[in-house]
Amino acid sequence: RVIDRLFFILYNCFNALKRNGLKQRIIKINFALSLKEEIRLNSGDKIHRCKVNKEEIMTEILCGIMLVAFFVVMIGVGFYSRKHATNVSGFVLGGRSAGPWLTAFAYGTSYFSAVVFVGYAGQFGWKYGISATWAGIGNAIIGSLLAWVVLGRRTRIMSQHLNSATMPQFFGERFGSSALKIGASVIIFIFLIPYTASLYNGLSRLFGMAFNIDYSVCIILMAVLTAIYVIAGGYMATAINDFIQGIIMLFGIVTVIAAVLNSKGGFMAALDGLAKASDPAVTDTPGIFASFFGPDPLNLLFVVILTSLGTWGLPQMVQKFYAIKDEKSIKKGTII
């Protein structure tokens, strides 16, 4: 925004210079040393002033550089992973060579994606208050830990024995039914469309708020970048990028929690402020949002079960067990 304004002012100044001639006309740009700066462009007949914030400019420039670097790394990882995508198995499963760290982070980032920052933090956080923490605990124990313990080793062994690379192929080989294979493919194709759309929606809204980028531009940009590195490197490209993004997410979550608690004067002060919050549309009970059982414990229980056990059947989650290197890696991945 600041750069756009500067270009607009420069354009007007040069037009004024052109109209009045260049003789004895100069452009002066004066920067103050304080945080509040004023840029003066003297075109001879008029002085244009634009007050800007030095920190704001530097922050936007730094964010832009980091964003471009992130995109470059994503695409670079895609082309780097091409060596693993020389055949169908390599493209879909990375040659079954993904280690425990890559697989664990790929599982985690697929599970705790936009829902953490948009769904849980926004909808569930306000609807249930502090009790929404149970959703995160349930997801971590039931949706992640228990899924790795129950499904990890069995899925890895059976998928390799049946030489299956996808869930529909696994069903077809396991039960000897082409109809089941086709049916599973159709179901996955249909219902993953709104699922994927919700992820792009959440991601684009976050980018839009953070960088003031148009929502449609974010959608197109994310889709194009994802398509490039997925088509170029297949599963291994997504696993490596998920690992990188997982580290960023962990750092971001810790930073957000620390910033929020610091702005509210600590955990107890934040909890006290939450106790004073009220929403007649949810409940009239005072202090209910600070309760660890929340305004609707039964409904919250269903949310925990749905979001924890429901992921056990998602193909993009189960496929992580298809691609992991060996049983030893599954044990390490479970801990990670």
Protein language model regions, located:
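Hydrophobic alpha-helical transmembrane segments
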Residues: 180, 286-307
